Amino acid sequence: MVQGDIADCINASATEVGVFGHGYTYSGHPLGCAVASKVIDIYQRDNIFEHADSVGEYLQTRLQALADHPLIGEVSGLGMIGAVELVADKASKKPFDGMKVGQFCAKAAEENGLIVRPLGGNRVAVCPPLIIENEHVDELIDKLSAALNVTLDWVRAEKLV
């Protein structure tokens, strides 16, 4: 462990101030804990969890409506997190090779003002903020649908389907 001059320096400082001050930002630091405690208070005061539960159900319903899109093999999600799996063949759910289709779709969404996350297996995930409203979910789904259509045109042009 710590010895010699380093230990002497730490001991001298701790003796002078009356405490051995230690810790890390992400391991119980008082300031980080105070912020986290206040955030929890705000979440409870503003009913953020109940709101997210309600809007999350709406998000999942709207995401499921995308299941008929020719590129989507599966829609998955829970609450305020959702994803669509992009497949080369809807009937067999044959995947695309690599991640380029998911990455293209994410770029198309971004160009339309929507940030999504491309995942492995050509999945595209959405994870909106907990304070989103139903009308924002509608906008999110409209923009994702537009990105899926642009992606479909691209995979056809590239002869990936």
Can you name each region flagged by the protein language model?
Residues 1-161:
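Conserved N-terminal phosphate-binding loop of PLP-dependent enzymes in the Aspartate aminotransferase
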